[in-house]
Amino acid sequence: MSVLPNAGNNESSVTAPKMFGDPDLDRMAMEYVGNMQRYRENIIIPKSNGPVKIKTNEEKFIETAVESCGFKCTMACVMGYGLGAALGLFSASVNPNMADPFANEKKQTAREVFREMRSTTHSYAKNFALIGCVFSAVECTIESHRGVTDWKNGTYAGGITGGLIGLRAGVKAGIIGGLGFAAFSTAIDYYMYSR
């Protein structure tokens, strides 16, 4: 008893039932089960919650680009630069002039104040951009290597980033920087994942 219809003889498949006693049921069953060549317009995808949307190739391309390590590093660098510039501008604006007010020195002109403000803002911005880029690159590399997205990635990345940045001041500063940055990253991840 074959489930596939005879390709050469259509009349024999209609007249002689293959699966059921009724030829109409047999034709219907063979159309739904046996015909593997038919074009399927509607694909039924089981859904759990809400509607199921199949992504187009363009959406998949954009999603892949946005989730890449290069894009994450670039975004962290740009956003770190912006945050550092804002903090640098704020700290430069509240920084008091350390010159003695009773000394006979000339006061700073507006141009000198703005030049100093610009250099402070740029210095903060560069440092924050560097920290953001290094942290993002290390975290993305660890996440890609481990294949898991959890709080440990941020902790490891924080330890490595803090260690690398603190290493400029010595080994002891590198160890303290790594531990501090790892603890801070863990606290931030815990706060973000617990909400």
From Swiss-Prot:
Query: Primary place of residence?
Result: mitochondrion
| A GO BP annotation | protein insertion into mitochondrial inner membrane
Query: What UniProt keywords apply to this chain's record, in alphabetical order?
Result: Membrane, Mitochondrion, Mitochondrion inner membrane, Protein transport, Translocation, Transmembrane, Transmembrane helix, Transport
Annotated Pfam families: Tim17
Indicate the quaternary assembly: Component of the TIM22 complex, whose core is composed of Tim22, associated with the 70 kDa heterohexamer. In most cases, the 70 kDa complex is composed of Tim9 and Tim10.
Q: What is this protein called?
A: Mitochondrial import inner membrane translocase subunit Tim22
Sorted alphabetically, which InterPro entries does this protein's record hold? TIM22
What organism is this sequence from?
A: Drosophila melanogaster
Q: Where is this region: Disordered?
A: 1-20
Q: Where are the transmembrane segments?
A: 74-94, 128-144, 164-188
Similarity comment: Belongs to the Tim17/Tim22/Tim23 family.
Q: How does it sit in the membrane?
A: Multi-pass membrane protein
Q: Which residues form the signal peptide?
A: none
Q: Where in the cell is it found?
A: Mitochondrion inner membrane
A Gene Ontology MF term for this entry?
Answer: mitochondrion targeting sequence binding
Which GO CC terms are listed, alphabetically? TIM22 mitochondrial import inner membrane insertion complex
Provide the function of this protein.
Essential core component of the TIM22 complex, a complex that mediates the import and insertion of multi-pass transmembrane proteins into the mitochondrial inner membrane. In the TIM22 complex, it constitutes the voltage-activated and signal-gated channel. Forms a twin-pore translocase that uses the membrane potential as external driving force in 2 voltage-dependent steps.
